[in-house]
Amino acid sequence: MSEMTPREIVSELDSYIIGQHSAKRAVAIALRNRWRRMQLGEALRHEVTPKNILMIGPTGVGKTEIARRLAKLANAPFIKVEATKFTEVGYVGKEVDSIIRDLTDSAMKMIRAQSIEKNRYRAEEMAEERILDALIPPAKNNWGQTEQTNESSPARQTFRKKLREGELDDKEIEIELAASPMGVEIMAPPGMEEMTSQLQSMFQNLGGQKTKPRKVKIKDAFKQLIEEEAAKLVNPEELKQQAIDAVEQNGIVFIDEIDKICKRGESSGPDVSREGVQRDLLPLIEGCTVNTKHGMVKTDHILFIASGAFQVSSPADLIPELQGRLPIRVELQALTTEDFERILTEPSASLTEQYQALMATEGVNISFSADGIRRIAEAAWQVNESAENIGARRLHTVMERLMEEISFDASEMHGTAIAIDADYVRNHLDELVADEDLSRFIL
């Protein structure tokens, strides 16, 4: 679980997302409150529930990007889902309970990786011994029984030294490695994924853990043996309990496109993929118990962050009960020309930096002048205003169009330096930007 302060979280998000300070502050406070809650006594901790967040803003302003970056910062079970993929219980499609099942699977993977890393040193020692046994097989007595290995024998120590120095990495040995589990592919109808995964687990466990001799390079065998030995040191039941605890205490669910499940106008008949989904989400967000293959999971303290553009609907179109369960509202602002300029240069691995690195692989040196970047930002903003406003995603389209000629000819331009200034941008983009019909379809 992350112990970063809200200021540190916002600073980290600033490295990737331009503007949207109020949204960054809201998620930073929510993330820090997870840590604060865990410092409380057990009785009070149980009473403190997370304040769920609703992020409102046009497409392409950073809602999903905030979720992606938050997942890396949280160091807690995290899952991002699209609200449009679910239908009401009893109809064909995914049920909302699968969100918690997927979150628990994600936690299992995270906790298993942490446990393996914790036991890595011991696993490496055991893997090393198995490779040395394959290189210097233990002697057998007159009755054909394997004698105890002499750990300090000169030959074994010599091979150990060579192994650690990497001299034997490319040498092939025959060694007993775990056989791949029986692969059974089952095509599941929508909504039956849980049953399918249980059937697959059952088939995989039928044969037990078998090994078979394989001839492999030592460096490849070493990696696999470390995984095998580390897995032996991990208690599966303990892992399950730790994963369930992590989900219940620190789990975060990000629900994207929640505006797409708002009811639109008066309609007769059941609305199974809109209002029905909202009603199914209510108990999940309020707190209920979900049955997963790893055990029962309580959702009382899972943090839910929902986001939507709300261009053809408003948050008031959500059912009142759901609105009440998303008490913190954050509005993200549409991007300006200045924001586009900053997006092109400031974030880590910005778009301009990416294109420079890609062209450098062909020996072409690309440089962007300040007036060139300003003109690219103006072109993107102009097209957003005249056509559909898709936010920062428009920059990808504009940049790809601008760089198309260079990208095509780069392999024949080794050693060339190209400066992209305002004149270069005007020559390549102005005609398209000025013609609304062309920009609508090409940009």
Curated annotation (Swiss-Prot):
Pfam families: AAA, AAA_2. One of its GO terms (cellular component) is HslUV protease complex. Keywords: ATP-binding, Chaperone, Cytoplasm, Nucleotide-binding. GO terms for molecular function: ATP binding; ATP hydrolysis activity; peptidase activity; proteasome-activating activity. ATPase subunit of a proteasome-like degradation complex; this subunit has chaperone activity. The binding of ATP and its subsequent hydrolysis by HslU are essential for unfolding of protein substrates subsequently hydrolyzed by HslV. HslU recognizes the N-terminal part of its protein substrates and unfolds these before they are guided to HslV for hydrolysis. A double ring-shaped homohexamer of HslV is capped on each side by a ring-shaped HslU homohexamer. The assembly of the HslU/HslV complex is dependent on binding of ATP. This is ATP-dependent protease ATPase subunit HslU. It comes from Edwardsiella ictaluri (strain 93-146). The lineage of its organism: Bacteria, Pseudomonadati, Pseudomonadota, Gammaproteobacteria, Enterobacterales.
